[in-house]
């Protein structure tokens, strides 16, 4: 083997490795599955998290086979290079079922989910709402939250409502979604166990004292998109939401020093 050919092989290997590293650096994964926030008769908010800073998209439509409408997300910084995405779907019909999926700039695509817009106030439609709290992980019973969803809420809805989870209008969580306000606590102990329901039903949480542990409530606010109709000095901490003829009021009852 000549010296020049040996050098050529080394350069070729180096180029191949560099190309592989470039491809790896631009790969993108969905690390928090899509979940719904802040719905209305005409809008729905979809949020999710990726591990690289690239554009995100929501494709949506009236059927799972016709996701022909697209919304581009806005995003904020998460842990490391992660981005927390928020996409607002507008121009919807009230009390109507839609389908959606999210995808990344690099072509990673989520499963296809559905949601239903809220009924109007004047419809005075009766509602089914799930209210639960204090699902922060207990080390001695770490799977309780997941069990409540997969062995409680979902089968009860499927057995008692004509359209299953589609007939649940909202999930209310008055605090203590997580044990500590860290990224791993949010991803591993709240979002992962709740993936059976949060992509389909909008969630309306308020912070408990556990959300303050470690980071204040910064991650609670980063992972939430709540009505901006409360106190201007504390947006998304006090709010109200009208669903049919029901008004839901969310109140943060914690002091700024709740991390005690």
Show the residue positions of the predicted features.
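Divalent metal-dependent phosphoesterase catalytic cores across multiple superfamilies
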Residues: 28-207, 211-237, 242, 258-260
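Serine/threonine-rich, low-complexity intrinsically disordered segments
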Residues: 4, 24-26
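N-terminal secretory signal peptides that target proteins for export/translocation
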Residues: 1-9
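Residues within helix-turn-helix
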Residues: 254
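Bacterial N-terminal signal peptides
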Residues: 13-24
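Residue-level detector of intrinsically disordered/flexible regions characterized by low predicted structural confidence
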Residues: 9-11, 103
